[in-house]
């Protein structure tokens, strides 16, 4: 299978995973990116079996609406049963790097509201140590230079993502050359820098379930509590 076929396979596996739990009042959290798009397309098959979805980006909201899946504002719902999203990297503890699509802040907010965070990814995203993929950081525009200097002090090499404006009106710095041995600690450190909205480490709230597409099929991975 090529990468797109692996993404389709994990999207189908995620649908199979949640299908027995869907009820008429279930509201799902939906992520952003190519793998999440495959899941949205698969979700259309069962759109009459749940109430609707909260999207982590304008792009995902539009795709859901095209499938006639009702889209709700997060502030209008009390909680989410599942959050389904892809990742740019995952380690064996299901700590993630996300944000290649610049939706990291909204993804993190939606994930925080979900009882179960299901990460769907192909095997190319599996790493022992996070950091080969540059870590995205959403930054208030006027703080860009200051935040970049602080990130250099942490050992990173920040690069301004040209032409990228987030759904929140902010900019993205991609931080290269980080070997992230302590993801929770680094997530906290970066978030404490004045001007940072949030960073793409999902370590304080990691995934609960990883559906990993491989040539041998889709593997279901959970971290023992």
From Swiss-Prot:
HAMAP family (alphabetical): Rib_5P_isom_A
Protein name: Ribose-5-phosphate isomerase A
GO annotations of cellular component type: cytosol
Keywords tagged on the record: Isomerase
Positions that bind substrate: 32-35, 85-88, 98-101, 125
Keyword Isomerase attached: yes
Organism: Hahella chejuensis (strain KCTC 2396)
Role played: Catalyzes the reversible conversion of ribose-5-phosphate to ribulose 5-phosphate.
């Amino acid at each position: 299978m090529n990468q797109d076929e692996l993404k389709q396979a994990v999207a189908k596996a995620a649908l199979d995973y949640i299908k027995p739990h869907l009820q008429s009042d279930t509201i799902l959290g939906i992520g952003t990116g190519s793998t999440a798009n495959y899941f949205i397309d698969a979700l259309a098959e069962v759109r009459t079996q749940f109430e609707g979805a909260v999207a982590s980006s304008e792009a995902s909201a539009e795709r859901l609406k095209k499938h006639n899946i009702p889209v709700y504002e997060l502030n209008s719902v009390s909680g989410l049963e599942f959050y389904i999203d892809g990742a740019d990297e995952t380690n064996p503890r299901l700590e993630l790097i996300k944000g290649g699509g610049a939706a990291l802040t909204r993804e993190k907010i939606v994930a925080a509201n979900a009882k179960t965070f299901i990460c769907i990814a192909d095997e190319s995203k599996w790493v022992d140590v996070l950091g080969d993929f540059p870590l995205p950081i959403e930054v208030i525009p006027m703080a860009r230079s200051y935040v970049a200097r602080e990130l250099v002090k942490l050992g990173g090499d920040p690069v301004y993502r040209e032409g990228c404006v987030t759904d929140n009106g902010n900019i993205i710095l991609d931080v290269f050359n980080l070997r992230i041995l302590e993801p929770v600690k680094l997530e906290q450190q970066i978030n404490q820098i004045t001007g940072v909205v949030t960073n793409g480490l999902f370590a304080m709230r990691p995934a609960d379930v990883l559906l990993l597409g491989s040539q041998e099929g889709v593997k279901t991975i959970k971290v023992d509590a």
